[in-house]
């Protein structure tokens, strides 16, 4: 699969998340600032909760709303406590007003988490 359009920039303000379910895996888009959007798997590796319900932090991490698992949005690594397995991070780019993701370009070697809600 190549890059596909999953959202428009207008759909996502800086500091917000957006659930994308059109791809074969559930994706959480995170807009860090005007020209930086990240794409991670939408399933927390701690208790399999949806990450788009979490909060974006100033240090470019995402905190799960359920149990406060925290993930680095660049590496997918768990930060702090509880220490949990890493989160898959996917290739994401902005072209014009479009946000594109390539689900086949995983940027780390994290295993794909089980996602019971999808």
Task: Give the ranges of each region predicted by the language model.
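Mid-chain, well-packed structural core segment of small domains
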Residues: 56-90
